[in-house]
Amino acid sequence: MLHKNRVKNRTHMTSFRVIIISFFCLILVGTLLLMLPISSRQRCVTSFPDAMFTAVSATCVTGLVVKDTATYWSLFGQVVILMLIQIGGMGVITIGLAIIRASGRKIGLRQRSTMQESISAPQVGGIVKLTGFILKTSLIIEMIGAALLAPVFCNDLGIAKGLWYSLFHSISAFCNAGFDLFGIREPFSSLTFYHSNIYLNIIIMLLIITGGIGFLVWGDIRTHKHRIRRFSLQSKVVLMTSAVLIVLPALYFFFFEYDHGTIHDRTIHSLFQSVTTRTAGFNTTDLAAMDESGTAIMIILMLIGGSPGSTAGGMKTATFAVLFLSAITVLRRRNDVQCFKRRISNEAVCSAGAVLFMYLVLFFTSGVIISRVENLPLLTCLFETSSAIGTVGLTLGITSGLSAVSRVILMILMFFGRVGGLTLIYAALPSADSQNSRLPLEKISVG
């Protein structure tokens, strides 16, 4: 039995390391491709720091850029960026397993275990079928999104360019990347040109939400259809938390930030800002015009991020929900954290606390360092670091002007936010043997 546990732990740890190494390899390949003269419009070699920052941002589906995607990168460079977004969003392991399966080779237990960790699945059983479902559904949704965006972009840009823009922005939105090609109108302008186009705003929002709720929720929807009562606890928590984190911030933006214009414009702007802030990084309004309270709320939303096993980053909605429920449990003086008539394990509660601690320390420390190095306001730098660690991509306009030190910090945060804090820690530390004996219990005062 002890031997089996050690083998299991060794495989478990290997899975985490495989995930990290696969992302590193993808970033390296992307960096080298973006450095090629064919990748830039000027047909010049892009510097290693600029190419690597772009590759990290694309692979980690963030959207922070130091070179405007539309005006600096050639069509080849844009295709490379889009492929990095697609593979990074779906997960390198997911794509790899699909290739192995298509070649007819057998998928072993180690590969299945790695896939399980990659998408935060509760068990190894059925993981291969789930992988096929994820890829097939993702491609279908992205194609539908591109088809729905095509009338708008083809009308504005012509058929050929419009189709390319439709595909690019559909994949970018679904993968929660936030990369855009509208620097042709004004560099780093995102979707501000379409701020009044309700149809386009709705399509982009739906793509963002679909990609951000997580692959496991899709699996429940496929299996149980509309019978929500049969959904797993995680799916219920994710759907409930996501709905709350869309509606409440939207109400704030509606009443306090967008307090001018028609009801329709205020509603669509508020909803879009609420949806995109947690994961995607598109913006239709000038973020620098927001007051400090609005900026602070956006920082919190970016830190929370998307859902487990999704294309998004951040602490995750489930983590936020567990932290909230554990606080309620303490205040009500109960022993167990409960939700939807189920008990949440102490391991999940402790993991949520560890994730919160890591994110807050990294986010705040990095913001302070960048503020000192760049001599910029702390709130502006905290906005940037929360955007990076949440893999969101929103910025107050300082990214392209940052020094090498600050860019390295942002790259580390983006990688941390995409791969996951616990994955990095588990990969770096040796597995702990289970303790057969427990130490004496002693109380300590807190609060």
What are these regions (language model features)?
Residues 1-447:
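Membrane-proximal intracellular helices of multi-pass ion channels
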